[in-house]
Curated annotation (Swiss-Prot):
This is Tropomyosin alpha-3 chain. GO terms for molecular function: actin filament binding. The lineage of its organism: Eukaryota, Metazoa, Chordata, Craniata, Vertebrata. It comes from the Eukaryota. The modification Phosphoserine is found at S62, S88, S207, S216, S272, S284. It holds the Pfam family Tropomyosin. Gene3D superfamilies: 1.20.5.170, 1.20.5.340. SUPFAM superfamilies: Tropomyosin. The modification N-acetylmethionine is found at M2. InterPro entries: Tropomyosin. Keywords: Acetylation, Actin-binding, Coiled coil, Cytoplasm, Cytoskeleton, Muscle protein, Phosphoprotein.
């Protein structure tokens, strides 16, 4: 019975150490996830500053958003792994607690048997006194029984001491398990906080994606307007060229008319001079 209890205590101790190691691992993974979340927040802040720059860098913002989404998925996976680890720790702690309950039940049974053994020893002692009163000739046998009784008492005392030590170790293990459970609960709480932060990061990413989509739509609109203006410019240039050719033709027509007018004026002056000369000749006659 004592060997079984010792083995069970060693197994419980190993289980406790494994639980502590897994709890520390969960805390380390949680810390790593928090650092990844902080890194994502810093990257988001950088992206928000870049989005305030110029619309010409929308392609770069789109690539940065893609990287941020990949990192967010990695952080979510880390958080999910940490939550699974915490759940595993909780299941492990529950199993250890159940094992402790069974050990306590076995200890209670052993203590009850020890009490029965002590009662049997007392009855044996009373029987020895009866035998001593009934027959002094059985002194040698009585001495042997007395030695056996002392050995039984010694064994009972040793068993009592070992059971007390087992009970004390069980109390210590229960305290360690309670502290481990508190650490696991704290890690679970941290994971919940990290999950909330990751939700906020996801919302920020969605907002940035919406802004990028908005800028993309504005860029398409600007390109369409530029195309329309370019077509209008080409049309205006064509009309300007046509107008220039028309003006050149009109200017040439005006020049021709002016030349013709000048020629008519010269012709008119010549005719006037001839008329004046004819009138003068007629006057002279």
């Amino acid at each position: 019975m004592m060997e079984a209890i010792k083995k069970k205590m060693q197994m419980l101790k190993l289980d406790k150490e494994n639980v502590l190691d897994r709890a520390e691992q969960a805390e380390a993974e949680q810390k790593q996830a928090e650092e990844r979340s902080k890194q994502l927040e810093d990257e988001l802040a950088t992206m928000q500053k870049k989005l305030k720059g110029t619309e010409d860098e929308l392609d770069k913002y789109s690539e940065a958003l893609k990287d941020a989404q990949e990192k967010l998925e990695l952080a979510e996976k880390k958080a999910a792994d940490a939550e699974a680890e915490v759940a595993s720790l909780n299941r492990r702690i529950q199993l250890v607690e159940e094992e402790l309950d069974r050990a306590q039940e076995r200890l209670a049974t052993a203590l009850q048997k020890l009490e029965e053994a002590e009662k049997a020893a007392d009855e044996s002692e009373r029987g020895m006194k009866v035998i001593e009163n009934r027959a002094l000739k059985d002194e040698e046998k009585m001495e042997l029984q007395e030695i056996q009784l002392k050995e039984a008492k010694h064994i009972a005392e040793e068993a009592d001491r070992k059971y007390e030590e087992v009970a004390r170790k069980l109390v210590i293990i229960e305290g360690d398990l309670e502290r481990t459970e508190e650490r696991a609960e704290l890690a679970e709480s941290k994971c919940s906080e990290l999950e909330e932060e990751l939700k906020n990061v996801t919302n920020n990413l969605k907002s940035l994606e919406a802004q990028a989509e908005k800028y993309s739509q504005k860029e398409d609109k600007y390109e369409e307007e530029i195309k329309i203006l370019t077509d209008k410019l080409k049309e205006a240039e064509t009309r300007a060229e046509f107008a220039e050719r028309s003006v050149a033709k009109l200017e040439k027509t005006i020049d021709d008319l002016e030349d013709e007018l000048y020629a008519q004026k010269l012709k008119y002056k010549a005719i006037s001079d001839e008329l004046d000369h004819a009138l003068n000749d007629m006057t002279s006659i």
